Amino acid sequence: MTEKFLFLYLSLLPMPLLSQAQWNENSLVSFSKIIASGNHLSNCWICHNFITRSSSYQYILVRNFSLNLTFGSGIPEGQHKSVPLQVSLANSAHQVPCLDLTPPFNQSSKTSFYFYNCSSLNQTCCPCPEGHCDRKNTSEEGFPSPTIHPMSFSPAGCHPNLTHWCPAKQMNDYRDKSPQNRCAAWEGKELITWRVLYLLPKAHTVPTWPKSTVPLGGPLSPACNQTIPAGWKSQLHKWFDSHIPRWACTPPGYVFLCGPQKNKLPFDGSPKITYSTPPVANLYTCINNIQHTGECAVGLLGPRGIGVTIYNTTQPRQKRALGLILAGMGAAIGMIAPWGGFTYHDVTLRNLSRQIDNIAKSTRDSISKLKASIDSLANVVMNNRLALDYLLAEQGGVCAVISKSCCIYVNNSGAIEEDIKKIYDEVTWLHNFGKGDSAGSIWEAVKSALPSLTWFVPLLGPAALNSLLSPLWPLSL
């Protein structure tokens, strides 16, 4: 088991631990490059809030954007398969366009018969306990499998019998036929008075798809609005309205966020949609019309709590706060940060999301190879991957620590500075910026973060490995 986790560690961390020059795979450095490039920054410090093991990654729903999906036909293979990754859902104060992949319907409004052959035809009443009913009719197209219904038969017709039950797995609508020695579902008031369910996808009966596949999906978020128009919604709805297996994928930087099955449509005793607490969603880069039901939107993925403050060195007393990136503010592309003064470029958000999505994919793929639980283990490894990248950036000297922030320097050419000596020289500006009562403590914090001993670097390998794997040891027992 230990060897498997070692493989997982190596596959998730392709950057050589002993190299201070190769930072392309470090998420903190990548985030800084994207922010600097997307906002044309130079001569400034980008300070990130630290991400710890307890941090998580989440997505925001987006609005007011154009999106070109990739469409294909046939059974999804390879990268087009739908492998879920559960993510946290940021609360949104704004309504966003969502789409019901399959429309909901009120089951109690349907009159349906469930015909079964009885195994004991010479009885006055023919009960149909589970295992003694022979299903004879096929299901009406588009209806989901209902729950257990009371079943009985008598010469006078169908009556409720709460002691004998059959699983009503098939539905059809033969109102003109009598039971004729067959057990039929009671047509009266059900034990559950009413419920709302999603129809099954159009291509769910495809012969080559595994029969054990369970439809995926549920309601997504209170922020969803089915009436808000969006080009991707009409395209996806039209494409999935077919009995031929079809799939659709988002472009890089975007993901589908779909409601999990733990979120429930209204049912008897709960007249409103119920959502999980804390809110979660299933992340997909591709979905299909074979197994996906419920509500979906398009979103951007990012680590929870990643905050960015930019200190402009050309204006010593000015602090430009760019705010939280992809974290909890429920913002849409182009929305002005609530603290004012700055609007994110959509390319910046999209590139940040793409970078995090790549990390999430590598996590998910590695977990899949180990045949472990994606929802539980992938989240743990993902959180530790981000925390480890921040640790490496700090101890490797690429970022300077001020209070609870890890600061990356953007040089005159707009590139992320990776030369430790130049970083040390420029950090004097942060000392001057912080002149006042707390200047000494800030300066000491900065100096303490910059490495001065080369012997410390080789220790990063064992420390990083222990940091990544320590929360996973109980799983190997």
Swiss-Prot record:
UniProt keyword list: ERV, Glycoprotein, Membrane, Signal, Transmembrane, Transmembrane helix, Transposable element
Cytoplasmic topological domain residue ranges: 343-477
Name the membrane topology term: Single-pass type I membrane protein
Leader peptide range in chain numbering: 1-21
Sorted alphabetically, the Gene Ontology cellular component annotations on this record are: membrane
Transmembrane parts of this sequence = 322-342
Attached carbohydrates are found at 68
The record's tissue-specificity note reads: Expressed in placenta.
The record's family statement is:
Belongs to the gamma type-C retroviral envelope protein family.
What is the protein's given name? Endogenous retrovirus group V member 1 Env polyprotein
Protein source organism: Homo sapiens
The protein's gene is named ERVV-1
